[in-house]
Amino acid sequence: MNTYFQAVSDCDMDTFVKLFTSQDTSEEEHYRQEFEEQKQYISGYQNVKCYTTPGLRDGEMAAYVYYEILYTGVETPAPSLVRIYAIRAEDGSWQIDDGKMSEELTQYFEELSVNEDVRLLSKQTDEAMDAAMEQDEALKERVEFMKQ
């Protein structure tokens, strides 16, 4: 996931596309523009941590990725959490599954969402974000701006 965040920060589309199972380049320009625009507000990412659980089949996993967004002009990092499903590629690397989510996978993520560890991680991330925004008005304003 560090490679993912670095590719986003650098607008490195070659690396970014290779991180996904589809390797689809049709939206490459759209993502490049989005990442360039984000660079105005986001200076980077830090403290990337992956919490994984086995997937539905061998060579697959679900991951909850904790990371902190570094907004430009804001001192306090913004705690964040994202969920992904990854599949091991033929070369042994992991790729983010960007295909249409099957009913089976949807059900699997629903089951994971009630797992005590997943619920705790989500709660801790939300609480950390709330505390960070309470402590830093600039962060609160930036987060609200980015939601628009």
Listing of model-derived features with the role each one plays in the protein:
Residues 14-67, 73-78:
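Short solvent-exposed beta->alpha transition segments
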